[in-house]
């Protein structure tokens, strides 16, 4: 990354050239000389010749500024200087836009902590999710307390049926509350029984949502997917040779559970393979959510605020669970993006060679048009 000093050295001569000195095209090249190569001071590196008094004053001011910078920081590195004849030097191909490039570089200079791969973002996101979880619990704890007490007072079979109905509802595109049901199942029935209830309920809900969306909502889902580049990319990869792997990885991403069921319903994956891949992909988050539910221990300790130590352990376990879940989701996103890129390259190579891409006979794929935009493949 270029330092602010190097960027200043690049932008200053061009700014002066546009402001007062139209004949300073060779200025950056002369400044690029090391100390002592073209003279003993910055004044020897300035162009000699005529010019108005205002131009001479501007040149003297720029030379003094550069001399002070060089005396304090030393000569700039070669990587910080413009290429001979480049955009900032006003050479061929500059097109008069050198100053715009320099100013853009100055504006775009920022701390590396704002990068997408910085661990600071992960830490901040984990803290925000934990705070939202605690805030939600504080806001709805009274209603949640009564609801959990009511479910716990029901007959065991009736409670299980209620959870299954809940999983069926959240399996549709407009449903919400999948994670809440997972945590509630682990809280009420424990880790083992809660896991079993989750797996059975999710399997039934996924099956029903898949069949209903495939037979009744295909046109609606296809219209929504065509407006989303991310979902279209997932569909393209699913219709390739690694469809089951992509289904399993997509289950670990933040894409809503019901929306994923609708997206996968318009593909040509066989129903048994689809259900198996979905079950495998959902297993890690189900384990984490069930464990998170069991850490609530009892309603009296956490909801009624009767145990300070219980709150401390609960907060620590929630932070660890959310951090682990974030790591799993991040790794799944990396793998899914890699699979999407590989599929894009395969499709692009097939189109360049004049071959028909492998679409597994998908009817949805035949309704779309592949176009080249910016060197990539977009779905329109």
Curated annotation (Swiss-Prot):
Keywords: Endoplasmic reticulum, Membrane, Transmembrane, Transmembrane helix. GO terms for cellular component: endoplasmic reticulum; membrane. The chain crosses the membrane at residues 50-70, 84-104, 120-140, 160-180, 188-208, 308-328. It is a multi-pass membrane protein. The keyword Protease does not apply. It is found in: Membrane; Endoplasmic reticulum. PANTHER family: TRANSMEMBRANE PROTEIN 64. Belongs to the TVP38/TMEM64 family. This is Transmembrane protein 64.
């Amino acid at each position: 990354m270029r330092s602010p000093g190097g960027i200043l050295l690049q932008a200053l001569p061009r700014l002066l050239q546009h402001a007062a000195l139209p004949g300073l095209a060779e200025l950056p090249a002369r400044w690029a000389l090391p100390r002592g190569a073209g003279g003993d001071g910055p004044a020897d590196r300035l162009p000699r010749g005529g010019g108005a008094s205002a131009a001479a004053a501007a040149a003297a001011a720029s030379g003094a500024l550069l001399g002070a910078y060089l005396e304090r920081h030393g000569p700039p590195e070669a990587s910080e200087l413009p290429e001979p004849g480049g955009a900032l030097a006003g050479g061929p191909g500059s097109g008069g836009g050198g100053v715009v490039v320099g100013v853009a570089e100055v504006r775009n200079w920022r701390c590396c902590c704002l990068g997408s791969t910085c661990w600071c973002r992960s830490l901040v996101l984990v803290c925000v999710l934990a705070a939202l979880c605690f805030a939600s619990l504080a806001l709805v704890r009274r209603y949640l307390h009564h609801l959990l007490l009511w479910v716990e007072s029901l007959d065991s079979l009736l409670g299980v049926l209620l959870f299954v109905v809940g999983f069926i509802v959240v399996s549709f595109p407009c449903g919400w509350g999948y994670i809440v049901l997972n945590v509630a199942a682990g809280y009420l029935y424990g880790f083992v029984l809660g896991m079993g209830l989750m797996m059975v309920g999710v399997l039934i809900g996924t099956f029903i949502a898949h069949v209903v969306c495939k037979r009744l909502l295909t046109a609606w889902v296809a219209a929504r997917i065509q407006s989303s580049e991310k979902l279209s990319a997932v569909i393209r990869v699913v219709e390739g040779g690694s469809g089951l792997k992509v289904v399993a990885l997509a289950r670990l991403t933040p894409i809503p559970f019901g929306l994923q069921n609708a997206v996968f319903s318009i593909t040509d994956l066989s129903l048994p393979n689809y259900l198996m891949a979905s079950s495998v992909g959902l297993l890690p988050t189900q384990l984490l959510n069930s464990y998170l539910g069991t850490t609530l221990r009892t309603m009296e300790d956490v909801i009624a605020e009767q145990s300070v130590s219980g709150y401390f352990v609960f907060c620590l376990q929630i932070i660890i669970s959310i951090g682990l879940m974030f790591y799993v989701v991040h790794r799944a996103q990396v793998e899914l993006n890699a699979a999407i890129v590989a599929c894009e390259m395969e499709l692009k190579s097939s189109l360049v060679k004049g071959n028909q891409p492998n679409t597994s006979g998908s009817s949805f794929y035949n309704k779309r048009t592949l176009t080249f935009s910016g060197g990539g493949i977009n779905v329109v």
